[in-house]
Amino acid sequence: MSDTIQQEAPDNLQVTPTHGRSFAEKVWSACLGLIQENINTLAFKTWFLPIRPLSFSGSELTIEVPSQFFYEWIEENYSVHVKQALRQVIGPEAKLMYSIVIDKSQGQPVTIELPHQIDAAPAERSVRPEAPGQKASAERERLEIARPRFESNLNPKYTFSTLVRGDCNSLAFAASKSIAQNPGQNAFNPLVIYGGVGLGKTHMMQAIGNSVLENRITDAVLYVSSEKFAIDFVNAIQNGNIQEFSAFYRNIDVLIIDDIQFFAGKEKTQEEIFHIFNTLHQSNKQIILSADRPIKEIKGIEDRLISRFNWGLSTDIQAPDYETRKAIIQSKLKQSGVSLDPVVIEFIATNVTSNVRELEGCIVKLLAAHSLDNQEIDLQFAKSTLKDIIRYNTKQLTLETIEKAVCSYFSITSNDLKGKSKKKEIAVGRQIAMYLSKDMTDSSLKTIGLHFGGRDHSTVIHALNTIEKKIAASNEERKKIEELRKRIEIMSM
């Protein structure tokens, strides 16, 4: 619950019967409709959408604004429009109360009432602590009211739950989680995340914003690309709305700007960013930025901006390693409610190594192709469907490749496989390696025997017969051989 200042508008309004809180929303909504007709769209979104109607009693409407500055700006620039709207909706005797948020700390709220006259001398303040039980009641009342928000521009799918953490992004992930819990009140301000295309920078930044909104820390969260910021800035200058543009950004609590390298060479835009940055940072507002390279490597950015961008934490996101790529694929499949053969997952994770976006693109294409012809998504289907994305050179399959695959599968060493040990897992692995070598290559029995420890051809024949019998007698054994065969095919690509 926040401490508030309440200030009374000097309007002469008619007293009407008391209505419930929901009626306050209807009254304010009607007022907004009239106000919107008389001011431009940017001003309306900036200064009126964040206002919350709190109560309506008699002829008095109480609204909440985010800050003292917010209140003063409305009164200095839009008081005529507000007054006209109130009189049309409520009547000539309407009254307006402003509830101004001045503190978000915990504790018992204190309400201070002042006359709503900007040019008047400050009135004597009367402090009225809430009575026991009123705090919880007031909080419940506020939760029941629809809470207008800034248009955050966040993708609701970009959350921490859909973001895979790995060695490639561990520091950025940890810092982002910390910021989401306490934006602006940490050592990571600004947070700068840099890295190549498609590595998850945008997902990471928007996950912070979505978490802040979900936990109702603040509604004033904005994601914007550097390109859109620059375009809006130019439009604001051309349309004479630069004051409103600047004021809008100075009232953001969590500002997220993507791809700041595009500010390079734009002197006027950098000037505006500089002042916005200073205002937000001094007010402990959170700033989150991304770039395609380290800040110091971006040419055409002013030194004073580079210095400020380095005040907090700058961390990179790298290309995901093999295990992280598998986890990303599995996460995407889980979100889609689909399962895939592990061999297909391994095939994609092995061959798509550049970025997360390509991995997700492979899954989307596979599922789309599957939905069209309802074919089973096996390895061959995956190869055929993804041939335009995954380009690989098929290498000649060697006995060494088979040896590595078998050793990995049975968790044994090459020396074990070629040695004299008769331990069951080693002996079985050796026989399977010989069987697959004969089945998948053109090597002779003699060559196979020599490769696996200098054994003669009769030993190889015995191994072939043994494995063939096991395959015929056991589905489990057949599946084991088939899985190994697929692994070897992937390794040979």
From Swiss-Prot:
Region described as Disordered: spans on this chain: 121-140
One GO CC annotation: plasma membrane
Annotated segments matching region Domain IV, binds dsDNA: 371-493
Region ranges (Domain I, interacts with DnaA modulators): 1-105
Pfam families: Bac_DnaA, Bac_DnaA_C, DnaA_N
Keyword list, A-Z: ATP-binding, Cytoplasm, DNA replication, DNA-binding, Lipid-binding, Nucleotide-binding
Quaternary state and interactors: Oligomerizes as a right-handed, spiral filament on DNA at oriC.
Chain intervals for the UniProt region annotation (Domain III, AAA+ region): 153-370
Lineage per the UniProt record: Bacteria, Pseudomonadati, Chlorobiota, Chlorobiia, Chlorobiales
Coarse class of the protein's main subcellular location: cytoplasm
Molecular-function GO terms, alphabetical: ATP binding; ATP hydrolysis activity; DNA replication origin binding; lipid binding
SUPFAM superfamilies noted in UniProt: P-loop containing nucleoside triphosphate hydrolases, TrpR-like
Protein name (record): Chromosomal replication initiator protein DnaA
Biological process according to GO: DNA replication initiation; regulation of DNA replication
Domain remarks in the Swiss-Prot or TrEMBL record: Domain I is involved in oligomerization and binding regulators, domain II is flexibile and of varying length in different bacteria, domain III forms the AAA+ region, while domain IV binds dsDNA.
Role: Plays an essential role in the initiation and regulation of chromosomal replication. ATP-DnaA binds to the origin of replication (oriC) to initiate formation of the DNA replication initiation complex once per cell cycle. Binds the DnaA box (a 9 base pair repeat at the origin) and separates the double-stranded (ds)DNA. Forms a right-handed helical filament on oriC DNA; dsDNA binds to the exterior of the filament while single-stranded (ss)DNA is stabiized in the filament's interior.
InterPro entries on file: AAA+_ATPase, Chromosome_initiator_DnaA, Chromosome_initiator_DnaA-like, Chromosome_initiator_DnaA_CS, DnaA_C, DnaA_dom, DnaA_N_dom, DnaA_N_sf
Family: Belongs to the DnaA family.
Name of the encoding gene: dnaA
